[in-house]
Structures are given as C-alpha cells and as structure tokens.
C-alpha cells in the first residue's frame, strides 16, 4: 500500500510507541513545522479534570496521527474550500446540486457528444460537398480529415502529463473552448470565398450526337482551375484546433471520472461517457444530411436540385451551431473543482487494484509535477509490459474501427448495389445500436460481475475471439450486378476477360464522355454507365413512380412483348440472397469489438500507478492514433482500391472508383481484418499472463472506508476515524 494513500505502516506500528515519552515524537516526513503541532501539555489541558497518569501515554500517538493526517490532506485534498462548484469566488449554494459525479458526467457527455457529432459526423457527411465547392481532390480532403489526429498526437503528451497533475476540469473547459473555435474556423471559408455560382446545362442528351470536339475535355479541365483549393489550409487549421480541443476529453475526462467515483462504478461512468461519444456521429450524420438538403447560399433561388451533381448543400450551418454549443458547454465544466466532494476515500481503493510495480515513484507524492520527471515517467510506462501490450491491442482494434467506419458504407454500397445515402443509412442503423450498445454493455458487465485486473483482460480475450470468428462473414459476398462494358458485354458483343470497353456499335453514334457517370438500369436487368452509353437518344421523362425513364435505348434489346429498350435512372437492385445473414454477422463483429473497449480502458487504468493514469492514457492515445486511427483508413482504402474494376477519369488523372469486384473486396477485407484481429488477440493473451495481481483486495479496503455521507467531512477526521 503506498504510504501517501493511507499511511498504514505508521498505524500498524502503534504498540511500539505506547510507552514512549512525550519528547519522542518525531517528524513523520511531512513538511509541517513543529510549531503547528499540538503539544502534550495542550492536549492535557484540553482534557481538563479527566486527565490521568495513563493519558499521556496515548497523547503522543494522537499527535502523530494528526500530523500524518495533515500530511495526507496535502496530497489528497487541498481543503474543503477547493471542492465547491463555481467560478473563482462565485460559488452559490444552488450550483452545489451539480457538484456530483453524475452532474459532471452530464456535462462531460455533452462535450463528447458534441465532439463526436462535429469531427466524426459533420466532417464525414459534408466532405464531398466541400470537395465540390472548393475544387479539392480526394487526397486533399483526406489530409483535412487526418489533421485532427495529427494535432491530437502532437498535444497528447503535453496535455496528459501536465493536465494529469493539474486542475483537470479547467483543462477540459479550455479544451471545449478551443473545440468551439475550431468549428467556427472550419465554417469561415463559406463567408470569405464568395457566392457559389454554377452554369447549368439545360441541353438534352441528344446534343451529344454528331461531331465530338477534340479539345472539349481540355477546355473544361482548364476552366475548372481556380484558387478555391487554397481554402483547404483553413479547413486544416479548423481540424487542428478540433484535435487540440478534444485532446483533454478522452484522457483527463476519463481519469477525472475514475478518480471521483467508486472503482466498481467507474466502468459504468466511462461507458456512458463513451456511449455519448458514439451517439454523437449518428446525430452528426442525421443533422448534417438534413443541412445538405438546404442550398449552400441560403435564401438564394437556384434551378439546381438535390439530385444534381453540381448541388452543394449548406455544409457550414452545423459547424456554426457546434461552435456556439461548445462555448455554452465549456462554462459549467470550468466551474468544477479539482476534486469532487468525497473523492478522498477512493484513493485507497484505486491503489489496491493497481498491479504490483517496482518503479518507486509511488513513494514520492511530488513525482510527476515537473517537466524533469517526464523522461522517467515515460520510462516507467515503457517498462510496464502489461500497459504496452494493452496499448498495442488497442491500436489493432482502432485500425479496424477506423478502417471499417470509413469504408463500411462503401462495402454495403458495392455488395448490395445501393446509393451512397442508402448505404450510409444502413451502416448507421448497424453501428448506432451495435457500437453504442456494446460500449455501454461492456461497462455494465464489468460492474455486474465485479471484474478486476486479470478478469477484465480475460473478458477482452473472449470478446476479441468472438469477433475474430464472426469476421469470417467476409467469406460471403454478393455477385456483381451485370454492367455493360465492365462485367459483361453489350448485346451482340463479347467482353474480353480482364478488359473494359464502354464503347460498342450500339452507342457509336453518340459522343459519350466517360466523366459523365450517371448509371441507369435497363429493362434487360443490365446496368449501363450513362444514358449516352446505353444508346438513349432523348432525355428522360417522368414515369408513373416519379422516376426518370429513358426510352428507345439502342443498346438495350427491344422486345415489344416485354417492353425492353427502356431504362430507369439509378442502379439495378441487387438480388443477393445472403444479405440478411451478412448483416447479422457484421452486427456481431461490431458489437463484440465495442464490447471490449471500456473493459480494455479500465484494465489500462488498473495496471499503472495512480498519479500516472492521465499520462498513461495520453501515451496510449498516441500509440492508438499513430498505429491505428491514422493508418487504419489508409490501409483499408489501399486494400479496397485493389478490388476496383472501373476508375473515374478526372482530366487524365485517376479519381475515385465507380465499380468494385465484390468477391475481391470481401476477400481482401477478410485478410486485413483477420490479421489485425489475430494480432489483437495475441496482445491480450500476453497482457493476461504478464499482469501482476495486487497483493491486497480492494473489497476489504472498501468495507473499512468511511461512508459516502461522511466523505465530505474534514479529511483529517476521516483518516483519524480509520485508525
């Protein structure tokens, strides 16, 4: 047991000092001056007439306990006045109602919800509109998204080390303010770039017949060049501020919760916190999607429709609202004290669950408060094999989560032949209940079964193994819908194996441009690249169901009895029979992946000493982001690109992929997923065997601690009452 937590070694040596003289009282290691201690004479005078010859035998021990308690108060609490909720000297009684772990959890959940909604919701929803509005390439928008993680990695060491030994709510409050500034900066280009103006081509498809202009593509590509792409630097700055502001949230916020609640309740509090962070992106997708249905120039009339490839929605509204909300959330967080009332009693409980360490830093209460201790703090963590292995296991899980959350909708879009919005909606229906429910359930199970240390790691092993087995779902795939010139030949022609040819005799009369990708489904069940490549000579007419219908298409074999020769705008529906089973198993993969997230985080908090928890979480986040969150989307994107059949042509440069080979996509995702899942399983196995269980059970200590009702009393009285 660390001496600074309870001082048990001095208490156990009580019999040795029973018959010592009053002058034998010595300094217990505190910096308290002798004049501040009660003398035996003053103690005797306090007792009055009840004093006896035997009483002085105990008075020095009482004096020593008082000095020890005073020493403990210096480390455990700065005094009752520091536990009031408010701002500076303004601490009204009405605010103390919120000065509880539940009250702080509410505002912390609001901050994590807002961060998830902004960074993981709005950004992913509007990134395509930003590319179109500011003439950005995909790699440029990818750099904008990565700027968040880059900033977080750069700040994690500083914030977790100094913030962990500082006033955590103030760090969290200022972080929320920086997050709000980042949102306002991100919306700034809308107000400085001028109005969005676009020329609309009202001519029909029939104008593409006749002579093709050889320099038409070069002229259009030249006209597209502009200085709008330089605004990517403003977007990157906004994302950098997002990363800086969110850094304290998942390090200091977690440790502050863990420090101020009972150790068995900590997983539930942390699970609720992370569940709010997962529900945030879901709200971001819904709100961001709704805002994209509003034209970016609010109040200006336009002939564009939401189906037009030139349409740009009001992507900036969500960021303005997020910036204002962040400022409002920061105000109450800044008012919380360094420690919540009654938190002193949990120090001993947390120390009892910490694995046995030989770093000797726990004997020095002043350790970790200066920059000179930073190298030693890093070295202590690097010598902790359990901590390192849990970090590596978290990195493998983060790689899968980041990769699948980015390209999961694309997988559904290709496998089930869905539109981008339909695929994103379907993926959201799976992620919200599976991710949010798994996160909350993981914390509940740890508390329900009172798992500790090695038991938590065993639970992580079970979850990882289950999700690993369920990952074999990617052995299944849906067959590709037939697409003329890509997966099958046109009517009356054969498609050479391994070659693409969109041109055929049936569309030779039309000057079709490959950049005009507008898929349509023919009445023969085959999908075509565009109305032009389907040989449709006239524009679309509105059908009975409100869909655009093209008639008399020369590439579609016409039969009067069946009505062939027509086509409907959009992709052909998939006839995949394994879709229900595939969705169920993907749900299992997601829920068991998130089920181990809170237990793994709890295990990390239990394998390091108390004063290093914030710093340990910061180091872990650096490892997770550097080895997982940042390279995850890049690795999965590279793997998925290997399955591409048809690439977009952007003025001679390769753009995004239009058509994937479903079988290859499933196979590559299976290989990548199993690789990271097996690595994560092995890391958890090694962490389980290297974890050193504490020698003292926290359950026994918990029974000896003062009740919650007395936790807000004088810390000196609490420690004296335990003797």
Swiss-Prot record:
Catalysed conversion reaction: 3,3',5-triiodo-L-thyronine(out) + L-glutamate(in) = 3,3',5-triiodo-L-thyronine(in) + L-glutamate(out); L-thyroxine(out) + L-glutamate(in) = L-thyroxine(in) + L-glutamate(out); estrone 3-sulfate(out) + L-glutamate(in) = estrone 3-sulfate(in) + L-glutamate(out); taurocholate(out) + L-glutamate(in) = taurocholate(in) + L-glutamate(out)
Keywords (A to Z) from UniProt: Cell membrane, Disulfide bond, Glycoprotein, Ion transport, Membrane, Phosphoprotein, Transmembrane, Transmembrane helix, Transport
Main location: membrane
Disordered: region residues: 23-57, 700-723
Pfam family, one: OATP
A GO BP entry: sodium-independent organic anion transport
Gene (UniProt): Slco4a1
Protein's recorded name: Solute carrier organic anion transporter family member 4A1
Protein biosynthesis among keywords: no
Record's GO cellular component terms: basolateral plasma membrane
Annotated Kazal-like domain residues: 500-557
Positions of modified residues (Phosphoserine): 39, 42, 45
């Amino acid at each position: 047991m660390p001496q600074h937590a309870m001082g048990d070694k001095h208490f156990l040596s009580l019999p040795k000092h029973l018959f010592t003289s009053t002058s034998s009282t010595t300094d217990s290691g505190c910096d308290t001056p002798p004049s501040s201690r009660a003398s035996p004479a003053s103690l005797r005078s306090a007792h009055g007439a009840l004093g006896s010859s035997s009483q002085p035998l105990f008075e020095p021990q009482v004096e020593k306990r008082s000095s020890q308690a005073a020493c403990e108060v210096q480390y455990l609490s700065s005094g009752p006045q520091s536990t009031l909720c408010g701002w500076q000297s303004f601490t009204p009684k009405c605010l103390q109602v919120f000065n509880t772990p539940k009250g702080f959890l509410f505002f912390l959940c609001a901050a994590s919800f807002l961060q998830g909604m902004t960074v993981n919701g709005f950004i992913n929803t509007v990134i395509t509109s930003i590319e179109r509005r500011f003439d950005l390439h995909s790699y440029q928008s990818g750099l904008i998204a990565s700027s968040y993680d880059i900033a977080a990695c750069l700040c994690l060491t500083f914030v977790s080390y100094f913030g962990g030994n500082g006033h955590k709510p103030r760090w969290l409050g200022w972080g929320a303010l920086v997050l709000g500034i980042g949102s306002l900066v991100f919306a700034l280009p809308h107000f400085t770039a001028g109005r969005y103006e676009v020329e609309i081509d009202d001519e029909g498809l029939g104008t593409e017949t006749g002579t093709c202009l050889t320099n038409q593509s070069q002229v259009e590509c030249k006209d597209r060049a502009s200085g709008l792409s330089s605004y990517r630097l403003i977007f990157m700055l906004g994302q950098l501020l997002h990363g800086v502001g969110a850094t304290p949230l998942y390090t200091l916020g977690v440790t502050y919760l863990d420090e101020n609640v009972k150790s068995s309740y900590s997983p539930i509090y942390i699970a609720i916190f992370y569940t709010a962070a997962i529900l945030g992106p879901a709200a971001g997708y819904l709100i961001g999607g709704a805002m994209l249905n509003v034209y970016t120039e609010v109040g200006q009339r336009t002939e564009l429709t939401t189906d037009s490839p030139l349409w740009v929605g009001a992507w900036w509204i969500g960021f303005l609202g997020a910036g204002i909300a962040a400022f409002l959330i920061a105000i109450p967080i800044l008012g919380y004290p360094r420690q919540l009332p009654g938190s002193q009693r949990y120090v001993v409980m947390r120390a009892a669950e910490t694995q046995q360490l030989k770093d000797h830093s726990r004997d020095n209460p002043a350790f970790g408060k200066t920059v000179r201790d930073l190298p030693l703090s890093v070295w202590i963590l690097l010598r902790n094999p359990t901590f390192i292995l849990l970090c590596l296991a978290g990195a493998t899980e983060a790689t899968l989560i980041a990769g699948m959350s980015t390209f999961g909708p694309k997988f559904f879009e290709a496998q089930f032949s869905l539109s981008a919005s339909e695929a994103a909606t379907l993926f959201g229906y799976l992620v919200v209940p599976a991710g949010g429910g798994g996160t909350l359930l993981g914390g509940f199970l740890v508390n329900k079964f009172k798992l500790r240390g090695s038991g938590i790691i065993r639970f992580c092993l079970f979850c990882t193994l289950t999700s690993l087995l369920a990952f074999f779902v990617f052995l299944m795939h849906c067959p590709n819908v037939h697409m003329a010139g890509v997966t099958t030949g046109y009517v009356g022609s054969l498609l050479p194996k391994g070659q693409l040819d969109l041109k055929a005799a049936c569309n030779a009369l039309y000057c079709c441009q490959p950049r005009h990708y507008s898929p349509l489904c023919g009445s023969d069940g085959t999908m075509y690249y565009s109305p032009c490549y389907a040989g449709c000579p006239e524009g679309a007419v509105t059908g009975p169901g409100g869909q655009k219908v093209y008639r008399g298409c020369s590439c579609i074999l016409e039969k009067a009895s069946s009505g062939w020769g027509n086509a409907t705008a959009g992709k052909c529906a998939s006839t995949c029979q394994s879709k229900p089973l595939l969705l169920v198993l993907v749900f299992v993969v997601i829920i068991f992946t998130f089920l181990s997230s809170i237990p793994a985080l709890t295990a990390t908090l239990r394998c390091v000493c108390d004063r290093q928890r914030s710093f340990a979480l910061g180091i872990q986040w650096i490892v997770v982001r550097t080895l997982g969150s940042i390279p995850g989307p890049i690795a999965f994107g590279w793997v998925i690109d290997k399955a591409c059949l048809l690439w977009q042509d952007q003025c001679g440069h390769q753009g995004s992929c239009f058509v994937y080979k479903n079988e290859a996509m499933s196979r590559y995702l299976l290989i990548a997923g199993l690789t990271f899942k097996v690595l994560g399983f092995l890391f958890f196995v090694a962490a389980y065997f290297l974890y050193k269980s504490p020698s003292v059970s926290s359950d026994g200590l918990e029974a000896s601690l003062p009740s919650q009702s007395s936790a807000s009393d004088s810390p000196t009285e609490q420690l004296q009452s335990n003797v």
